[in-house]
Design a protein with these regions (language model features):
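Basic phosphate/pyrophosphate-binding loop/patch that engages nucleotide-derived ligands
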Residues: 171
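A short His-aromatic
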Residues: 154-158
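Conserved N-terminal segment of class I S-adenosyl-L-methionine
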Residues: 1-145, 149-153, 163-166, 240-241, ...
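S-adenosyl-L-methionine-dependent methyltransferase catalytic module, highlighting the catalytic core
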Residues: 160-168, 178-291
Length: 292
């Protein structure tokens, strides 16, 4: 790493404090802008190993298509109705095995992908026949102003340099282009983690694993907005993400109970969102859309 001491990717401050009770997760928070992140950040090959493990163990790629199908279609419908022109060029960053690209293509988009996994890239090229770049967005050599929409769905939190990633996305978007981001909501994950931490004996008795998820970066609505503004974006809309189905992490053994838990969580947080006029956003994941 370039620095042995933690520093903030968003504002550059080194006024960083480790969070409790998150010592095991190595979570730190910037005291200036409140961005939360792990430190030290892992090397790139370790990140690749984590991504490959995710697609083979935690969330096998065969299950992704069905689990996120409804979410993908709702997002595409929203983009088509609100933002995208008739000629639609999409770049899906962290495209995995190309399921979002495939759905977009079926709806008339010209889909391109970026993926760090060799297996994912080969699958997309050989099975789906879409153009895909192996690597990360920062080093990709696309021409500026090439795309109408760039999607980073559950991806930005795993980027070692999310600010530079967003700045590169800004350059690659056409005028009035759109970036669509889905990521875990730090506020929700923190609440769940604290409940599990202080009631751990009870969850251990029921053999329920800790459901909270913290990646390299953990964004709240305010910190993702600050980062998008710093990258040059405007007209930033943040809301609770649409639901995905299933329980890929195996937290709830009953699929019916998993579905009920998700639905109740989603609609209770939606009520908070609407009754607060969009000021309280506590869903498990955020959907963020911003314009160039």
């Amino acid at each position: 790493m370039e620095s042995k001491n933690p520093y903030c990717n968003l504002c550059g401050s080194n006024n960083i404090k480790q969070l409790t009770p998150f010592q095991k997760e190595r979570l730190y928070r910037c005291q200036k802008c409140h961005l939360v992140f792990r430190w030290p950040l892992p090397e790139n090959d370790m990140i690749l190993n984590q991504v490959e493990k995710h697609y083979t163990e935690a969330d096998p790629h065969q299950s992704v298509a069905s689990a996120k199908n409804k979410f993908f279609n709702k997002l595409l419908e929203h983009l088509e109705n609100k933002y995208a022109p008739q000629e639609r060029e999409l770049l899906d960053v962290g495209c995995g095995y190309g399921y979002f690209m495939q759905l977009a293509s079926e709806r008339g988009w010209r889909a391109h992908g970026i993926e760090i996994m060799e297996k994912g890239c080969l699958y997309i090229k050989e099975k789906l026949n879409f153009p895909v770049y192996k690597g990360d967005l920062i080093e990709a050599d696309y021409a500026q102003q090439s795309f109408d929409v760039i999607s980073l769905l559950d991806v930005l939190v795993m980027c070692p340099d999310p600010l530079l990633t967003l700045k590169k996305a800004y350059l690659l978007l056409k005028k009035k282009g759109v970036v669509a981001i889905r990521l875990r909501n730090y506020y929700f994950q923190r609440i769940i983690h604290q409940v599990y931490h202080y009631g751990g004996w009870l969850f251990s008795k029921w053999k329920i694993p800790n459901p909270s998820v913290f990646h390299l970066y953990s964004f709240s609505p305010s910190t993702i907005k600050k980062m998008l503004l710093k990258a040059g974006f405007n007209n930033i809309k943040i809301k609770n993400s649409y639901l995905t189905t299933g329980d890929p992490y195996g937290i709830v053994k009953s699929s019916f109970l998993a579905k009920i838990t998700k639905v109740l969580t989603y609609y209770s947080t939606q009520l908070l969102y609407y009754f607060s006029f969009g000021k309280i956003i506590l869903g498990p994941s955020l959907l963020v859309i911003a314009n160039k």
